[in-house]
């Protein structure tokens, strides 16, 4: 769950593997290339709240951006945003410094929500902020359901990994909305995507479309095609150490418009490919059709090299709160401890409600959540 300033991206990791797809849509255009399966919505910390003609509160996709940014930045922004709502609810503080030199101002944030009130039946900017926060959380919940429930997975069986500059501020509230009982917030979560880019192993894919019925395919001809693909990716990858290669195929039942990518092993066996596809289809869609014929749409070779990730070991020296402030939980404002996350040593226990502030993000831990900081600085909380 990656929430930034203008958008939120959600993906699924199942059995240690990130879900991938060969079908996506960008700007209304279908894209058919291998990619990580990500559901994106236009809701982030800078997303602007408004009231539509029917009186319903909407959040995004319009964004205040970085300039002028949310009203609380004090840079001339006048529209109410999700970040402004978080400030009025106490999740961010006026003593919170974002980046190196940006101090938040509650006055402009309050004024922005006051301008929203005439279009609602509310008379309190804090009540409007609560509504905006709830609407934003529900939009994110719908995105999570699209990558879980819609694909036949129960989100209650997963942990929510929250990152991005704004993600950890909504993580436990989002988890409660989905009845998820475990949340993990990695260290350096505000720049985790950039860190992942640097640490990710080199990967190269090659594919060939064949579109043939599985029960009539020539296994030897398929093997020859796989060998040519292997030669191609090996030439492009060079000779890095620790290279692993897998053979895959995009398969579907006859008449379907979507495929599933299945690892089929070597040498190519139609019977093994069929059984793995039936099992994959049942996991992904909830059913199998053993009497239906299967089509081989594309064969693929996936080559991954090793990568030396950065050292992200963690040391801290202070486990006590640095202060307290009033924050909104359970229908009321409550005195809430505030911690400096980068100073928390591994093994520190955290009981909600609590707020953990760091250089690039803020973590909000709701009531009934508790957990600890592990040796890498990851915060793991559950309820």
Q: Where are these predicted regions, by residue range?
A:
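C-terminal, non-catalytic interaction/recognition modules in large multi-subunit enzymes and RNPs
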Residues: 5, 44, 53-54, 59, ...
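Gly/Thr-rich phosphate-binding beta-strand-loop-beta motif of the actin/hexokinase/Hsp70
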Residues: 1-14, 47-50, 172
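Conserved beta-strand and immediately adjacent loop positions that scaffold enzyme active sites
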Residues: 9, 37, 361
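Short glycine-aspartate micro-motif
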Residues: 1-2, 38-40, 184
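Early-domain small/polar-rich strand-loop-helix modules and first-structured segments
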Residues: 14-88
């Amino acid at each position: 769950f990656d929430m930034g300033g203008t958008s939120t991206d959600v993906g699924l990791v199942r059995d240690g593997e990130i879900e991938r797809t060969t079908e996506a849509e960008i700007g209304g255009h279908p894209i058919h290339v291998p990619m990580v399966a990500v559901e994106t919505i236009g809701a982030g910390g800078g997303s602007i709240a408004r009231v539509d003609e029917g009186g319903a509160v909407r959040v995004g996709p319009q964004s205040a951006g970085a300039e002028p940014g949310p009203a609380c930045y004090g840079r001339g922004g006048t529209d109410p945003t999700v970040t402004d709502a978080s400030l009025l609810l106490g999740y961010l503080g006026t003593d919170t410094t974002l980046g190196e030199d940006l101090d938040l101002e509650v006055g402009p944030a309050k004024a922005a929500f006051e301008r929203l009130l005439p279009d609602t039946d509310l008379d309190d900017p804090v009540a409007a902020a609560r509504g905006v926060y709830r609407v934003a959380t529900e939009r994110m919940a719908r995105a999570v359901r699209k990558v879980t429930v819609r694909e036949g997975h129960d989100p209650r069986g997963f942990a929510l990994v929250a990152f991005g500059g704004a993600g950890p501020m909504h993580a436990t509230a989002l988890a409660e909305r989905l009845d998820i009982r475990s949340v993990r917030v990695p260290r350096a979560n505000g720049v985790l995507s950039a860190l992942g880019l640097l640490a990710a192993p080199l990967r190269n894919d090659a594919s060939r479309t064949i579109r043939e019925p599985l029960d009539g395919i020539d296994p030897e001809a398929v093997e020859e095609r796989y060998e040519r693909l292997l030669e191609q990716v090996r030439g492009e990858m060079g000779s890095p150490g620790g290279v692993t290669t897998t053979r895959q195929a995009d398969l579907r039942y006859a008449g379907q418009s979507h495929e599933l990518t299945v690892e089929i092993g070597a040498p190519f066996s139609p019977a093994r490919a069929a059984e793995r596809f039936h099992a994959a289809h049942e996991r992904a869609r909830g059913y199998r059709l053993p009497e239906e014929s299967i089509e081989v749409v594309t064969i693929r070779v996936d080559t991954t090299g090793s990568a030396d990730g950065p050292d992200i070991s963690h040391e801290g020296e202070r486990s006590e709160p640095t202060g307290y402030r009033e924050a909104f939980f359970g229908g009321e404002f409550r005195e809430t401890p505030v911690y400096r996350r980068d100073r928390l040593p591994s093994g520190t226990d955290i009981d909600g409600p609590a707020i953990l502030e760091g250089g690039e993000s803020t973590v909000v831990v709701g009531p009934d959540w508790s957990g600890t900081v592990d040796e890498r600085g990851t915060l793991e909380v559950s309820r």
